[in-house]
Each structure stands twice: as structure tokens, then as C-alpha cells.
């Protein structure tokens, strides 16, 4: 019997929400050891699910914790020890998600090289207004220059990378459908107000102010009552709160959302709204697709991959209050005519593109392509 390809899969807690679906599928065909690098006291999302998968023998997962912050010089010793252990294992392929800014990836390159390494890179283009913009930009630039093989999570990011570095090899996979538990569909059927949702960490480039202003204009023009749920943590919420004139329109859940509460928020919502000014890709949009929810989003390449205008949602001019207002008014006037068709279209798109098996198959194909290239060197 031919031995399975041995793969080290190295990532961080932020990616568990996706990897927990993919690693078990890939592990059916490859011998995967999944390393999760976390801070000592960091609470891991889905930890119970991971423990269950380990007990069932579906994954070989090692959670490794360090005391230091990524930016502390003391963490360098911890990283070096970990990387030396990986080197001793002599894996056929190392799949490394880009993590550990600013020290980890330079140390990885020094100790492990790039020959049998595939780098998973989420944001080739760093969104304007994101945290630590220039440091992130330099870190990504270093990685692209220093490694040969990459995997992005959208075709748009793949194209961005190949524009910057046409001599590199880059594949892409979609995000897996991100499932936070079942929803009670009768909740939507029995409620009497249309509900728009924005979910996720609130950052400047996501332009929550555009949603607030557009919702209030739509209310003033139509006089129709509806609901806008804004759910997610925010470091400077007061600047958004000051824009709200009609408190009755908004349900505000401004805090970190527990995983167990995500499905409950989505089951009460009809449309997902993302009026971003810039974006590389959006995990929250994939959650909406998982729950068959039509999306209103900015006309940006990252969203155009997933949203077909007037079929699975609506595309608006980026961060444009007037355009979003028009779209919300159209929905308020036509919701009961258009909604079921939109939902069915989203569901069909999900089944054709985002099942665990389909996404895992793309990972395996990409791994095999890169393994073949290693042998050709």
C-alpha cells in the first residue's frame, strides 16, 4: 500500500472556523498534522468541536501555546524551537498560512526554506483602513518575495498576486461554507419587519456609517418600519452612535459575538449588508451564503466573485450612501416579490461551490500540483 503524503498544516486560531471543515476531508487522502499556534490564555473558537474530531480520529491536531505576544522579541526563541521541530519531521509538504507578524515568516523562511512550502495568503491587497496597514503591507510584500508557491482564497487575490509577482506559482480555493449551527427558518417566516444585518468586527473600511445613513434616508423617504442589526466588536463605536437619529430602526449588539449566538442573529435577518470602501475578501459574506441570505455589497472584485447582481443579491457603488439607499428602498417595496427567488439562487450557488467536499478537493488538487513541481526542481 502506498504511503500517504505527509503534510504539516500550520495555522492560527483565526482560521479554525474554516480549517475545521477542510482538514478532516483532506486527512482522508493525506497524512495531515494540523498545528494551531495560539497565545497561552487565548480562548479558541470551536474548541469542543476540535476535541470531538480528535477523539473520533478524524484529525491529528496539536494546539501549541506561547506566552509572548507576536511583536515581543521573546517569542523568537519559541518560534525557532517550533520550526526546528517541524524541520526534523521531514514533511513532504508544509502548508503554512501567513501568520505571526512580524517575526514568524522571516524565521520560517530562514529555517525551513521554500522548496516544499505552500503559503496560504488571505490578503494580498491590504484593505485601506485596516489595522496596522503599513506593517501588514510590508509583511505581505516580504512573503511574496521570499516564497515560490502560494494559495489564495479568491480568484481576485490570485490575480492581484500574479500582477505583483508574475513569476510565482499561485492557486486559489474558495472559503468553505462557514456554518455556526442550524437556524429556525420559521423565525423569518413569522416576523413582520424586513431586517438588514451587518455582522463582524467593525473597522473603518467597512463603512458602517454608510449603512446607518442609508437606512435612515430609506426610512425618511418610505416611512416604512424595518430593522437594521449591527453586530460585532468596535473600538470606537461612539462615532457611529452619534450618527443614529432613529434608535427604533437599529438593534445594536456592539461586542464580540459568541459562536453560539451567530446562528440566532442570522435567523432573524433577511439581507446581509456590506457597503465597504475596500476589501480583499470577506469571511462574513460566506457565513451569509451558508444561511442562504441575499447580500447587498459594494461592487468590488472580492464580492463580485460571490454575488450576482439581482440574482443572489445586489451590488452597489462602494461606500455610496445614495446607491445603498436606493437599493434598500427597492427591497422595502418589493421584498415579498423577490425574496424567495433570491434565497433559492443563493442556495444553488452554495451547493455548487461551497460544500466541504468540493473545497477540500481543490485543496488536494493544489497540494498535488505543488508537490509535482517540487519533484521537477
PLM segments and residue spans:
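Acidic donor-binding loop of glycosyltransferase active sites
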Residues: 264-280, 293
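Conserved acidic donor-binding segment of nucleotide-sugar-dependent glycosyltransferases
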Residues: 309-310, 314-321, 328-336
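Donor nucleotide-sugar binding/catalytic pocket of nucleotide-sugar-dependent glycosyltransferases
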Residues: 145-183
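Conserved donor-binding/catalytic core segment of Leloir-type glycosyltransferases
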Residues: 189-206, 212-215
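Short N-terminal targeting/anchoring amphipathic segment
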Residues: 8-11, 68-74, 82-103, 149
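An aromatic- and histidine-rich active-site surface loop
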Residues: 16-17, 78-79, 94-114, 280
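Nucleotide-activated donor-binding/catalytic signature segment of Leloir-type glycosyltransferases, i.e.
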Residues: 239-263
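A short, well-ordered alpha-helix in the C-terminal region of glycosyltransferases
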Residues: 337-353, 362-365
